[in-house]
């Protein structure tokens, strides 16, 4: 496998009014008990390390975390196996695991965004967008959607404010379910502090997919992966409505994606 440093990169140019961060951070404290609970999770460590000895951690039968990624020899890249598999949580191995960092094939998102991404002015979306300078294979990791981690109360306030002032909205809500029951909600806002993930626009027929990835913290990272092979110069987009599009809310803005199946409006996941 190529050295992770040859494939990944996180020194992208960004506008000055945004603090560039490498991974999600806690929102400023508002002193609420809701914030304290979020902070507790943020500061916790997942204690479910694998006990593999020098293996590749590829297989769920041998590694408690494995089975979600596969190494594509042709592209010399680790990729997410099948999108349907994400019904099972993606948990990467970490420094506390028994495996070796050099041979483990269950570490991807933790190495940061891929190289050859470019922020550009998208004429279709009449604002910034993100595109790739080179071909990206299906399942490849693009980047994290990193920003401030918000409480539900703070997210509702910011959404309302964005709506009232007609600002662009960067708040993303990801619900995780188990047996149809909602287990956890993760809300990320890269409007003030964020990474390159903040430039992906919404499409009703997207070429990227967003999934929850845990490394060593109970709060997942929001990982953006290629939903299909993506050609050089293609703009990267994902569906803002997330996992259950029947529950999408209408953000009140016309969608500019121009896909054949476009609903005509920009969605977001509802916050309950
Ligand atoms: C996460 S930001 C994406 C990056 C943004 N275009 C920029 O210039 O920074 C989300 C905002 O981009 C715009 N946007 C994204 N997808 C869109 C779409 N399909 N149709 C219309 N506007 C879109 C909306 O203003 C939305 O609030």
Feature-to-residue mapping (PLM):
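C-terminal SET catalytic tail plus cysteine-rich post-SET Zn-binding segment of SAM-dependent SET-domain
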Residues: 2-3, 15, 77, 152-184, ...
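Short beta-strand element of the conserved SAM-dependent methyltransferase core
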Residues: 52, 130-132, 223-225
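Accessory low-complexity/Zn-finger-associated flanking regions
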Residues: 1-127, 254, 259-272
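Catalytic cores of histone-lysine modification enzymes
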Residues: 73-77, 85-96, 100, 107-214
